[in-house]
Curated annotation (Swiss-Prot):
The name this protein goes by in its record: Sec-independent protein translocase protein TatB
Gene this chain is encoded by: tatB
Annotated region described as Disordered, given as residue ranges: 86-131
PANTHER family assigned to the protein according to its UniProt record, in alphabetical order: SEC-INDEPENDENT PROTEIN TRANSLOCASE PROTEIN TATA, CHLOROPLASTIC
Cystine residue pairs: none
Similarity comment text for this entry: Belongs to the TatB family.
Single GO molecular function: protein transmembrane transporter activity
Compositionally biased residues, Low complexity: 115-131
Gene Ontology biological-process entries: protein transport by the Tat complex
Originating species: Shewanella halifaxensis (strain HAW-EB4)
NCBIfam families in alphabetical order: tatB
Keywords linked to the UniProt accession: Cell inner membrane, Cell membrane, Membrane, Protein transport, Translocation, Transmembrane, Transmembrane helix, Transport
Length: 131
């Protein structure tokens, strides 16, 4: 815990603390300092553990990607075809829903479609007071 501090230094710190704080406040000061040290150690250990866990996850992820890329290259044609079919099925599920019954914009006659000129004119007329 105290790598660079020997017994004599600890004894000197204790005597100075006793003189400065007095016998009433010294035990509470020692408890609070030890709780701070404990909290800092706990925080440092949790950060270290979290970083190690993230590095392990990242390593596993990269290993999985490498194994997947090498494994897909060595597959038989039948397995490759089935994987392609599964990928196509997954893409079709991910596509947004498209309605086939609604006519496209090019099928609607021009007089039914509002143009930007008519909508601008309508907006300009709506700004004029009625009267």
């Amino acid at each position: 815990m105290f790598d660079g501090i020997g017994f004599m230094e600890l004894l000197l710190i204790g005597i100075v603390g006793l003189v400065v704080l007095g016998p009433e406040r010294l035990p509470t000061a020692v408890r609070s300092v030890s709780s701070w040290i404990r909290a800092m150690k706990k925080m440092a250990n949790s950060v270290k553990d979290e970083l190690e866990q993230e590095l392990k996850i990242e390593q596993l992820h990269s290993d999985l990607k490498n194994a997947e890329s090498q494994g897909l290259k060595n597959l038989s044609p039948e397995l490759q075809d089935s994987i392609n079919q599964l990928k196509e099925a997954a893409q079709s599920v991910n596509r947004p829903y498209q309605v086939e019954d609604v006519p496209a914009a090019k099928d609607v006659p021009a007089k039914e479609m509002p143009t930007s000129e008519t909508s601008t004119a309508t907006n300009a007329n709506s700004d004029k007071p009625n009267g």
